[in-house]
């Protein structure tokens, strides 16, 4: 639970990007993650002609977007007239007269701000997609463990905790936490470059 109340009044960025929901009217997009999913959701909604107000607790929109993609996204946002609010957290949501009231909070000034919208989309990253990892772990030679010292010293992973193990298994990328593609590829490369 990322905010006080009104969780049932919002949808996730993935609900939007996978077309599980169709939104119209004024949309508040709250992006606590600052990565591609939030910016991509804003672009997707703008392409559909929606009126989007993007809010983030960070000092800038898309704080984890790289320098190549950032200018293109911001240009699109400005050209579309998208409203952007930084340094504000989503505190709560409530329904009133058929609309949703989003209560925001600025940590810098300790002041609240309320926005009235038709829909709220929240991007908080993802929980680890670790079900396959845990299912396979018991049959792995290393029981899913990574030798951190060997990893740091660029040595092969040789842990053998299961003599009946059939393979080595390592937990990287979204199996650990919300990651972008570059981070997951970097983790895989670092781990596998000495095999």
What are the roles of these predicted feature ranges?
Residues 1, 86-101:
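A conserved short coil-to-beta-strand element within the FAD-binding core of flavoproteins
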Residues 1-67, 107-119, 123-195:
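Rossmann-like dinucleotide/flavin-binding elements
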Residues 73-84:
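Helical element adjacent to the flavin cofactor pocket in flavoenzyme catalytic cores
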Residues 78, 87, 107-109:
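Residues that act as N-cap/strand-start positions at coil-to-secondary-structure junctions
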Residues 103-105:
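Short beta-strand segments that buttress and anchor functional surface loops
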């Amino acid at each position: 639970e990322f905010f006080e109340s009104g969780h049932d009044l919002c949808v996730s960025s993935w609900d939007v990007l996978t077309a599980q929901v169709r939104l119209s009217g004024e949309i508040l997009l709250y992006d606590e993650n600052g990565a591609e999913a939030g910016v991509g959701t804003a672009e997707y909604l703008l392409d559909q002609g929606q009126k989007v107000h993007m809010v983030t607790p960070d000092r800038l929109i898309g704080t984890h977007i790289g320098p190549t993609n950032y200018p293109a996204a911001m240009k699109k946002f400005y050209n579309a007239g998208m409203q952007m609010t930084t340094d504000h957290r989503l505190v709560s949501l409530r329904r009133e007269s058929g609309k949703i009231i989003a209560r925001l909070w600025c940590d810098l000034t300790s002041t609240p701000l309320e926005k009235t919208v038709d829909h709220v989309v929240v991007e908080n990253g993802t929980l680890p997609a670790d079900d396959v990892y845990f299912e396979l772990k018991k049959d792995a030679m290393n029981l899913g463990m990574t030798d951190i010292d060997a990893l740091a010293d660029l040595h092969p992973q040789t842990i053998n905790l299961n003599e009946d193990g059939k393979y080595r298994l390592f937990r990287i990328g979204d199996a650990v936490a919300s990651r972008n593609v570059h981070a997951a590829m970097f983790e895989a490369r670092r781990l596998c470059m000495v095999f």
